[in-house]
Amino acid sequence: MSCPNWYIIELNRFRIVAWDDAEAQNADGTFAVHDLDRIDYLKHHLGAVGKAIRAGVPVEGYFLWSLMDNFEWAHGYTKRFGIVRVDYDADCRRVPKDSFAWYRTVIASRELPEE
């Protein structure tokens, strides 16, 4: 039995909100703005959310972590989770990453782009 089917049968009285979903990058600057791994991660996770909704799971929402790179309790500034890069060495200048543009398109269209 698949997880969505198990959920529908056993736990359908609860609503689901997926939150704090993130793909981290190292803070060494590698792929700091061109974050294709994050886009791939989001495609798979949002695709799974869509599949669950189509299967009848009552998903109420999805929250991406995070809008901007920030201080993480477990990692300090060594991991970057944001879809906007924060340059900690240059007055915290903010630069939208490729994932920002991709996620903006998804939100505006309310669907995942075709490959």
Task: Set out the residue ranges of the language-model regions.
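Non-catalytic scaffold segments within catalytic domains of secreted glycoside hydrolases
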Residues: 1-115
